[in-house]
Structure formats: C-alpha cells, structure tokens
A protein has these predicted regions:
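N-terminal, active-site-proximal structural segment of metallo-dependent hydrolase catalytic domains
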Residues: 1-61, 75-77, 232, 239-243
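Active-site-proximal beta-strand elements of phosphoester/diester hydrolases
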Residues: 1-12, 95-97, 111-125
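Catalytic metal-binding/acid-base residues of hydrolase active sites
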Residues: 4-6, 42-43, 123-125, 155-158, ...
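Extracytoplasmic/secreted proteins, especially bacterial periplasmic and envelope-associated proteins
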Residues: 20, 24-27, 31, 53, ...
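Loop/turn elements at helix/coil->beta-strand transitions in domains of secreted/extracellular proteins
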Residues: 32-36, 63-67, 115-118, 145-149
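Active-site neighborhood of phospho(di)ester-bond hydrolases with catalytic His/Asp-centered motifs
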Residues: 37-40, 69-72, 150-154, 178-181
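Structured beta-strand-rich core segments of catalytic domains in phosphoester-bond hydrolases
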Residues: 42-117, 210-216
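Metal-dependent phosphoester-hydrolase catalytic domains
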Residues: 96-98, 128, 140-150, 157-243
Length: 243
C-alpha cells in the first residue's frame, strides 16, 4: 500500500497538525490492515510540530505491530522530513536501508527486504530530470536483488502524461504498473501520481496478484465515510499472494 499523509494535517481547507488528524490517517491503515505501507510527507523532531515522530505516532495509533523505517530526506524546522515505511514484523524483515535520490528538495528511497520480496518506498521530486535520474537509481537498486521487488509511493509522475511522464519511460524498463490508476488525488479526480509497481526479477510466477484499488470511501464501524478530508491523496493498495 502507498499513502501520502499530507503531514497528517487533514484536507479540510484549513490544514492543521493535530492528534485527531494523525489518528484519522492511522485508522485508514488499520481498517485496511496493510501488511506494508509506504508513507510520504512525514516529519520528525520539527520544532513547530512539538518535535513529534510522525511515523511512530501513526504506527502507535494503528495498534498494529509495525516496524518503523523513516528516511530523513531534508532539514525542516530543526528536524527532518522524508518518506517512510511501516512493515508488519510478522513478514520477517531481513534488512532495511535508505538510498539518497536527486531533487530540488532532499529525496530518499526506503528499502525493506523481507524473506519473500523487497519493498521500495519513495516520494519523487517535482523536477523532471531529477525523477528521470531517480528512476535509473531505483532500477539499479532493484537489479541488485534476486527476488521480486515492489516500488510504492507518490511518484509525482504519471504514465498518462505527455511522453509517458519523466520517470515512467525509465521505470518501465524494469517495472510494470500493478496498482489501480483510477485517480489518486481528491482535488484532481482524473490524476494519478501514486503507484505500486512490480519487478519480477526473472521470477514471474513468484506472486499472484489478487486485487487493487484506490480507496475513496471506507467503512468505519458500520459507517461509510469519504476519505477526501483525511489527506490530499487517497490510499492505493495491492493485494497479493506469494507462492
């Protein structure tokens, strides 16, 4: 799964940092029961945000036993901002690392290796050339493994853009789009920039793909609620089965 948190400020027209907004974001992850999720727009130690560790706060609010992997990509108000990954400890995490990516802002790639697959989480830059270069780096990282690799994140790029975008012509040399592309931004219903991609690394039969979706409504305790006020992005999930 991939989900841009919008720094858990809420998408109500008056963004504000609050515990309630963090809990609202976390309950989406809890309700979907994501095994592993790439999250973008996280902060840690920022003076104007009570020095919170947002990824840890999200993990705690889900009540799920997640391992937390944060990638400090750029300085922000005495702390750091960047992407991160929550991964259930039950998946059997073998290793984690971060890889620096180019950009006008600091950018990072989170790498989580489990027994059965590798998961890459990121938030690519707005600069076209930086995204192209990042795509090459990501392909190289994927090629370093002998097991299936998933790439999830806010790619700030779309396969539907002119020329196929900046990153996708490079990424699709290794990866295939496996997530739903029905529109991932509440404010731009036809725009898709949040993706989950797959590189089989020569093992095309290692994974069964069961279901995918962009979640725009969710049932919380019997009540269906719109998710367009939780964040300025919708969560995107991919349900798989390892063979």
């Amino acid at each position: 799964m991939t989900y841009n948190s919008y720094y858990c400020r809420g998408n109500t027209g008056t963004p504000a940092v609050s515990q309630t907004n963090t809990e609202n974001f976390a309950r989406v992850i809890k309700t979907l029961d994501a095994d592993i999720v790439a999250i973008q727009e996280l902060d840690k130690g920022a003076l104007n945000r009570n020095k919170r560790d947002l990824l840890q706060e999200i993990a705690d609010a889900t009540g799920i036993d997640y391992q937390v992997v944060f990638a400090p990509a750029a300085d922000y108000m005495g702390g750091k901002i960047g992407p991160g990954v929550l991964v259930k400890r039950s998946l059997g995490v073998k290793s984690t690392k971060t890889v620096e990516l180019p950009g006008d802002e600091g950018r990072m790639l989170v790498v989580v290796e489990t027994e059965g697959f590798v998961f890459l989480g990121t938030h690519l830059d707005l600069n076209d050339e930086a995204r192209r270069q990042s795509a090459t780096i990501i392909n190289d990282v994927s090629n370093g493994y002998r097991k299936p690799v998933f790439l999830a994140g806010d790619l700030n790029d779309s396969h539907r853009w002119s020329g196929g975008g900046a990153a996708f012509p490079v990424l699709t040399n290794e990866f295939a789009i496996k997530s739903s592309t029905e529109g991932t931004l509440p404010g731009q219903p036809n725009e898709t920039i949040d993706y989950i991609l797959f590189d089989d690394n020569g093992q095309p039969s290692a994974v069964n793909f069961l279901e995918t979706g962009v979640v725009k409504k969710l049932n919380f305790n019997g009540k269906v609620e719109d998710l367009d006020t939780v964040s300025d992005h919708f969560p995107v999930y991919l349900d798989i089965e390892l063979k």
